Amino acid sequence: MWKNREAQLCLFSVLLAFLPSASLLFGNSKYMVLVPSQLYTETPEKICLHLYHLNETVTVTASLISQRGTRKLFDEPVVDKDLFHCVSFIPRLPSSEEEESLDINIEGAKHKFSKRHVVLVKNKESVVFVQTDKPMYKPGQSVKFRVVSMDKNLYPLKELVQDPKMNRIMQWQDVKTENGLKQLSFSLSAEPIQGPYKIVVLKQSGVKEEHSFTVMEFVLPRFGVDVKVPNAISVYDEIISVTACDRYTYGKPVLGRVKVRLCHGNPSFSSETKSACKEENSQLDNNGCSTQEVNITEFQLKENYLKVRQAFHVNATVTEEGTGMEFGGYGRIEVERTRNKFLFLKADSHFRHGIPFFVKVRLVDIKGDPIPNEQVFIKAQEAGYTNATTTDQHGLAKFSIDTSSISGYSLNIKVYHKEENLCIHSSCTAERHAEAHHTAYAVYSLSKSYIYLDTEAGVLPCNQIHTVQAHFILKGQVLGVLPQIVFHYLVMAQGSILQTGNHTHQVESGAPVQGNFALEIPVEFSMVPMAKMLIYTILPDGEVIADSVKFQVEKCLRNKVHLSFSPSQSLPASQTHMRVTASPQSLCGLRAVDQSVLLLRPEAELSPSLIYDLPGMQDSNFIPRSHHPFEDEDDCLMYQPRDTEELTYSVPYGREKDVYRYVDMGLTAFTNLKIKHPTYCYDLPKEPPRKDPPRKDPEPKDTVVETIRNYFPETWVWDLVTVSSSGVTEVEMTVPDTITEWKAGALCLSNDTGLGLSSVATLQAFQPFFVELTMPYSVIRGEAFTLKATVMNYLPTSLQMTVQLEASPDFTAVPVGNDQDSYCLGANGRHTSSWLVTPKSLGNVNFSVSVEAQQSPEPCGSEVATVPETGRKDTVIKVLIVEPEGIKKEHTFSSLLCASDAELSETLSLLLPPRVVKDSARAHFSVMGDILSSAIKNTQNLIQMPYGCGEQNMVLFAPNIYVLKYLNETQQLTENIKSKALGYLRAGYQRELNYKHKDGSYSAFGDHNGQGQGNTWLTAFVLKSFAQARAFIFIDESHITDAFTWLSKQQKDSGCFRSSGSLFNNAMKGGVDDEITLSAYITMALLESSLPPVVSKALGCLEASWETIEQGRNGSFVYTKALMAYAFTLAGNQEKRNEILKSLDKEAIKEDNSIHWERPQKPMKSEHYLYTPQASSVEVEMSAYVVLARLTAHPAPSPEDLALSTGTIKWLTKQQNSHGGFSSTQDTVVALDALSKYGAATFSKSQKTPSVTVQSSGSFSQKFQVDKSNRLLLQQVSLPDIPGNYTIRVSGEGCVYAQTTLRYNLPLEKQQPAFALKVKTVPLTCNNPKGQNSFQISLEISYTGSRPASNMVIADVKMLSGFIPLKPTVKKLERLEHVSRTEVTTNNVLLYLDQVTNQTLSFSFIIQQDIPVKNLQPAIVKVYDYYETDEVAFAEYSSPCSSDKQNV
């Protein structure tokens, strides 16, 4: 390596300076003390003392002085006349980084010297990094990561995760690693903010380390495109060779076509408007490759070169044969002016008079390959030097320039090939040849003495000896009296002195002191990644002659880690062994990732280079803030004294180099030696002295036999293992079912040898042949589809194959065409077998297809059929959903049954309407011992409705709070339930942040790029829920503060709150004053959040409004009253609470031993019911608020409150659906809060064990026992007789919650719904051939119900069997005014409409055929009010090309 000795003074220079106050009484005695300018605690450091020509015994003392006291490092007498000695010490641990003073005292009988200088003492930083199990994640996946620390004595760390909006979504406090490693994980929500995320590790020092990963929706690619192009071409080239190769992740070539697009333009512009492009198309060959020779003469590279820097951008897109799947690759080509160029391998930044100046260059072509046997010329005008030589086989040319005759301070060198380029203007068309320039500056020495360290280029390998040549020339009048000259050297790395030594040169009388010698330097691990060497000698007159050099050291690790698989190629689902070799007792983190993930998002491979580039691994030399590099008053020669009263200081000028300026070693030095050359100065006005600002803490840096395949992970291995004392550990594991290549790696930490990293190990999961099934996601009973099984043979020989679809009573299957179950499959061939399948059963139907290679006496073509030794049979199982025709209906019958000594019974009749779809009826009976059992089991599935907006998401969040509180209070919380509930809370927290605005508010669909408006009601709901969730999960306090601040700004002088944003549930708009109802809700939320500052004014608003509310007749304001009752209960205003409850009691509906409340003008039901319909959302919500008002009484609810609440709880339980929720979101949240409080208030730990029997009028009977051990268990049985009569009996003592669920389908029939719904397809008929493969669905929707407008409306469009929606055409609907959100699933399209009036709204999108299906049945479109689910309309549509075409 050649030395880059920069001429300018940098902050990392050695500080060799006098302090003005230093006393020097030694005469000819010389001294130098060297110490690192930055010291690290808990790290051995050295201080080196050099005394020269002492004439008496002295005592040398070195001390570190800080605010904590004085610590002596060195205190010894020195008798020797000359001494060079280094002392080791370990700096103590300061509380924080601090500057300390290094005090040097040298004292003898006649002489005394003292000097003090500032050094920095700081804690040794642990080097920390983060590794994730893969670089990108899908929504809902678990993010696994490990924190790795190089410091075995690691202090507590804090990790947090930030999403793209910098929201803190997860946090771990005081994490302690085990042997330097800690693995953590967290789950992403189903709908997280997509984009880049950061894991931030905050170390004790305040320094942050960050690791990024990406969250996005993606489908793993099955193949990747590799584009091979030259790195560069010259302007004289006319052809570019572009090769595109494509292989599956399991290594086999892809068949298909490739399109290459080559664009020429300025690389700084991304837009193609700045580029000219060419396209070439070709077929991939049998190796999956295509090479194209592209003519580029039309781009006129020579003419354009000097106008703009040029480059070519190459994009290759491969289209897979058969599937049409596309994937791309990219390449870039730089355009250079010459066909070749020079690389300087050796050329110092400074020259020394009398010592040869060595130059080494390499001539390379445009690809970077060396060019041998070419003539190279050199010119050095100041030295009067010209020469020529021929490059060797490595393209190298070497020169040695005599510097003796140089009279100036610079040396300009020009190296060129063939001939000099004399024409450099843009108009020149002559070919330019390679040339390179270098300038070196003189090193200053008063005596013209110099030393130069010469070392070869390259990276030094660890654990070897490196030889450095030292060239010197020494002059001076006193040299003749010296018998010998001693050269001293130091080697530093990582800011510490590692090695010292010396070399003695004998001086011959009368001979010039000139020559060279070799120094052998052991290359140690502690020198990685860079070492610095300083050599110096002291002349008798005190002049220091020195040089320094840097060594690049191989980035090696002591802990040698090796990872391998045995065998390295395995069948899916077979056993393999992962073998790890490392230092004994190493803790190793293992990882293996599907190559498909890395194709989609390549990541930097964990390597020694990456580790040594981490913060904390770099040298950071230190210059004290108060120290000016030119402190001495006599440092420069003045041109002329100035007669002025102004203070002046001197500014050095010149580019000569001296010891002071070129020793880039990170040392602080104390010396009375001559180390600087005089510099010429001029004077400038000097500013008055300024005090340094107070010292601040450092700012934190922000700176991868038969097989049945069904297991397809993206990350296969993510484990920690400890290596045994032998240094080898083997882990047996099962290969996943994915046919791919797995990329694996290991990182290990050892207390003895530190960090080690393995190179990438690969395992090919492959079998010689396999089968893939093609089938639709779901069909409707009566439809038929073609099941295709494609078998691929990648063996070099032919196989006799049998393919079999396992028979089942759930479907019939007929082979298509002349397909046979046995056939011959040639080498590298594929074959598809097909069956026409008609499902007969409803529900999930399994299809199992097996292919097997068999022995056969018959030849396959001209070959004998072979049988592979392994992987002879492959079986794939896929599930098809078979649905009944018509519209799904569900009825739930729930009861809270409490028995004492006498048996309690209840009868139930399951009736079916006359036009029920055949075989679609099914029913089950459930028994639970706890009132919340069903909700606990189904907390993420409480209602069968979409969750796509900010308010609906909260039904996935808030109930978990009530469940955890309830189970905690009743001491029923298990680790399993707790883990799930906390996971749901964290996921809901992440999702809700999607709907936050920059001002701290929340709305149903977020800020829409700053266009949306915050919603007052939803913000209060989120604030309350986040505040309550703090007891269970991490909630960033800023989210609560931001919401509270925004709500405070919405409060009026009256104490009421103004409404902001849309209220999608217009029951909130139903009172005499919307603000009263809203204010009651917000007041309640603030009281539940323990945020009182604005509550007193809000309560005043409610009290002032009560008289108006109370005078309302016929229950006009019952919803508002229920909210106010709970708000005053929370505020502790018992008088007002009781007054409101008394008013509510007059308006209660009391029947069948139950109590509830209704609105006076609730919407009419839209259809005739066999059964009493489930109550609407508002009725459930207001009744639940009354229960909360009664049960939150202080200090405890009275017996009367409990008794009245029991009646309402009985009514509420009858409104529950089969999943434990209610009809919509807000009623589910409030009612579950009420049920949990009632359950806690009435919970009994008694050993009562009631039994429940359900019995039909026939022979069916099932008995359930409920006790303490299964209280939370949901026990269930299917009911066989539908229609039928059943009796439910409860005996023993205690309460049970019984629920019967009946489901069936009805054909679509004419009705009078609350919505007018029309559905049509375009084209209408099959005349257009495109209608068979894709067509447009158009919807027309208007509201015909009893209100002026609906609440939020959901339009649910089910897909025809075998069809999928064209996602971009659906997403485009979000641009329309009334469409707030769209969702696309495998089988449905959902449109969220903010509201619908009597004005018709129109929407359309395109669906396309994915898999052909025969006898297509119509698909259903359902439109319904989200909060009044009885307001619903249905329609159906058919494919234009289906038989019995019908659009309703």
From Swiss-Prot:
There is a cross-link at residues 949-952 (Isoglutamyl cysteine thioester (Cys-Gln)). Keywords: Bait region, Disulfide bond, Glycoprotein, Protease inhibitor, Secreted, Serine protease inhibitor, Signal, Thioester bond. InterPro entries: A-macroglobulin_rcpt-bd, A-macroglobulin_rcpt-bd_sf, A2M/Complement_sys, A2M_N_BRD, A2M_TED, Alpha-macroglob_thiol-ester_cl, Alpha-macroglobulin_TED, Ig-like_fold. Disulfide bonds join 48-86, 245-277, 263-289, 462-556, 588-748, 636-681, 824-860, 898-1295, 1056-1101, 1326-1441. GO terms for molecular function: endopeptidase inhibitor activity; protease binding; serine-type endopeptidase inhibitor activity. It is found in: Secreted. Residues 1-24 form the signal peptide. It comes from the Eukaryota. Monomer. Belongs to the protease inhibitor I39 (alpha-2-macroglobulin) family. A proteinase activates the inhibitor by specific proteolysis in the bait region, which, by an unknown mechanism leads to reaction at the cysteinyl-glutamyl internal thiol ester site and to a conformational change, whereby the proteinase is trapped and/or covalently bound to the inhibitor. This is Murinoglobulin-2. It comes from Rattus norvegicus. The lineage of its organism: Eukaryota, Metazoa, Chordata, Craniata, Vertebrata. The gene is Mug2.
